[in-house]
């Protein structure tokens, strides 16, 4: 099973692909879709959509896991991230993929064992669980891998991400 985890964003959209073989998780590929600040929102969304379609075509994941929108005080940021989530969900739907959505607290619970874990704790566990030499950067990439790990725990071992 191959899971594509995504941490939505318009400037940086992190992605991480993991493979699940029995009890073993391994990172296949990870990175970030970056969009220039000076471009229109429509252009940024098109870049995210096009790049994710290419990633899906290349790695052929069986599932897509997306972090749910965490509403913050900046409504404008929440709206633009919501738009990014929309094109991400569209890319997954066009490929006929099963989409799983998780709250940040669910991801932290699945990866660290504590739903209010610090970002550094999550990043360190991503490195350990996937046997990576270094913590993936930028943070959005480690977050995307964490979402994929949460999905793997949920689908493979029936662990409810609470």
UniProtKB/Swiss-Prot annotation:
InterPro entries: RNaseH-like_sf, RNaseH_sf, X-over_junc_endoDNase_Mg_BS, X-over_junc_endoDNase_RuvC
CC annotations in GO: cytoplasm; Holliday junction resolvase complex
Catalytic activity from the UniProt record: Endonucleolytic cleavage at a junction such as a reciprocal single-stranded crossover between two homologous DNA duplexes (Holliday junction)
Positions of Mg(2+) 1 binding: 7, 140
A single BP term in Gene Ontology: DNA recombination
Organism superkingdom: Bacteria
Active site residues per record: 7, 67, 140
Protein residues bound to Mg(2+) 2: 67
Annotated keywords: Cytoplasm, DNA damage, DNA recombination, DNA repair, DNA-binding, Endonuclease, Hydrolase, Magnesium, Metal-binding, Nuclease
Listed Pfam families: RuvC
Needed cofactors: Mg(2+)
Co-factor binding details: Binds 2 Mg(2+) ion per subunit.
EC number in record: 3.1.21.10
Segments forming a coiled coil: none
DNA repair found in the keyword field: yes
PANTHER family: CROSSOVER JUNCTION ENDODEOXYRIBONUCLEASE RUVC
Family indicated by similarity: Belongs to the RuvC family.
Subunit structure: Homodimer which binds Holliday junction (HJ) DNA. The HJ becomes 2-fold symmetrical on binding to RuvC with unstacked arms; it has a different conformation from HJ DNA in complex with RuvA. In the full resolvosome a probable DNA-RuvA(4)-RuvB(12)-RuvC(2) complex forms which resolves the HJ.
HAMAP family on file: RuvC
Cited function: The RuvA-RuvB-RuvC complex processes Holliday junction (HJ) DNA during genetic recombination and DNA repair. Endonuclease that resolves HJ intermediates. Cleaves cruciform DNA by making single-stranded nicks across the HJ at symmetrical positions within the homologous arms, yielding a 5'-phosphate and a 3'-hydroxyl group; requires a central core of homology in the junction. The consensus cleavage sequence is 5'-(A/T)TT(C/G)-3'. Cleavage occurs on the 3'-side of the TT dinucleotide at the point of strand exchange.
Protein name as it appears in the record: Crossover junction endodeoxyribonuclease RuvC
Gene source species: Heliobacterium modesticaldum (strain ATCC 51547 / Ice1)
Lineage, uppermost ranks: Bacteria, Bacillati, Bacillota, Clostridia, Eubacteriales
């Amino acid at each position: 099973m191959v899971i594509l985890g995504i941490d939505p964003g318009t400037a940086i959209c992190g992605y991480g692909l993991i493979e699940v073989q029995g009890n073993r998780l391994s990172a296949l590929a990870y990175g970030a879709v970056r969009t220039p600040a000076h471009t229109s929102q429509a252009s940024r969304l098109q870049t995210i959509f096009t790049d994710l379609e290419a990633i899906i075509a290349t790695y052929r994941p069986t599932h897509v896991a997306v972090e749910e929108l965490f509403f913050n005080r900046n409504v404008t940021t929440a709206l633009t991230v919501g738009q990014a989530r929309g094109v991400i969900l569209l890319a997954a739907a066009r490929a006929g993929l099963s989409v799983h959505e998780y709250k940040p607290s669910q991801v932290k619970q699945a990866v660290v064992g504590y739903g209010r874990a610090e970002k550094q704790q999550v990043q360190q566990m991503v490195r350990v669980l996937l046997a990576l030499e270094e913590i993936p950067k930028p943070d959005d990439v480690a977050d995307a891998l964490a979402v994929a790990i949460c999905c793997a725990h949920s689908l493979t071992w029936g662990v409810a991400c609470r």
